[in-house]
Amino acid sequence: MKLGVNIDHVAVLREARKVNDPDILNALYVATQNGADQITIHLREDRRHIQDADAYAIMKYSNVGVNLECSINRAILDIVTDLKPHRTTLVPEKREEVTTEGGLDVVGHEDEIAYAIELLHDYLIPVSLFIDPTIEAVEKSKELGAEMVELHTGAFANLYAMLSSSLPHSNHSIKELELPRHELSIRLEKSILAIDEAAKHAKKIGLEVAAGHGLNYHNVHEMMKIAEITELNIGQSIVARSIFSGLGEAVKEMKRLTSR
């Protein structure tokens, strides 16, 4: 399994005080020295964490592939085509969201996504689409010309957390998931099945398959059971763990959990 370490949240901490501490390049170095197979960053339109200068520096100094996440905004795409990352993952984006809330609407925004893919391909940049784990979204991704899909695991992660963590007893409990445990268990199994079926179908029609969003040290084993998934992109949980263990140890432990 290929482990993509998302270092956005290192930049979140830096931007909280508008200083160069922690240094994003230090995070890049430590992550790659301790098992990261890929570095993932999200260059958002609102620049809430990763800045343009970060993206250019990471592209310059990374000795592993860089997976750059971005929206289909033309101004952002112009920067991406200049950066020429090893891969671009197109993601949905809303300014008011705390984090990416769902997969790309590959049907509703078909023309805009097709244009973005064509533009990136003109610069020889492979494209992945961040999609909800449905057969329809997988098939549309193939039709649009993407080489890869990243299956959005957020719904799975939320259900897992409400069943198996202290989340229900915190201020961040997910109100719509405050359900009896047996109902949560049924929904969790359905979410895992949806990811499994989407991954198998994607592989069958010639797409590479990644997964990400909300994956952590407690739930990642479920994704490891799906052979068609060959890449996981994980960020917040690694950076959160690093507060207590150090970034190097946090990356090493996740690499151990995601090794086949």
UniProtKB/Swiss-Prot annotation:
The record marks E150 as: Transition state stabilizer. Its EC number is 2.6.99.2. It catalyses: 3-amino-2-oxopropyl phosphate + 1-deoxy-D-xylulose 5-phosphate = pyridoxine 5'-phosphate + phosphate + 2 H2O + H(+). 3-amino-2-oxopropyl phosphate binds at N6, R17, G214, G235, Q236. Homooctamer; tetramer of dimers. Pathway: Cofactor biosynthesis; pyridoxine 5'-phosphate biosynthesis; pyridoxine 5'-phosphate from D-erythrose 4-phosphate: step 5/5. HAMAP family: PdxJ. InterPro entries: Aldolase_TIM, PyrdxlP_synth_PdxJ, Pyridoxine-5'_phos_synth. The keyword GTP-binding does not apply. It comes from Sulfurimonas denitrificans (strain ATCC 33889 / DSM 1251). GO terms for molecular function: pyridoxine 5'-phosphate synthase activity. The active site is at H42, E69, H213. One of its GO terms (cellular component) is cytosol. It is an enzyme of class 2 (transferase). It is found in: Cytoplasm. This is Pyridoxine 5'-phosphate synthase. Its main location: cytoplasm. Catalyzes the complicated ring closure reaction between the two acyclic compounds 1-deoxy-D-xylulose-5-phosphate (DXP) and 3-amino-2-oxopropyl phosphate (1-amino-acetone-3-phosphate or AAP) to form pyridoxine 5'-phosphate (PNP) and inorganic phosphate. 1-deoxy-D-xylulose 5-phosphate binds at D8, H9, R44, H49, T99. Transmembrane segments: none annotated. Belongs to the PNP synthase family. One of its GO terms (biological process) is pyridoxine biosynthetic process. Keywords: Cytoplasm, Pyridoxine biosynthesis, Transferase. The lineage of its organism: Bacteria, Pseudomonadati, Campylobacterota, Epsilonproteobacteria, Campylobacterales. It comes from the Bacteria. Pfam families: PdxJ.
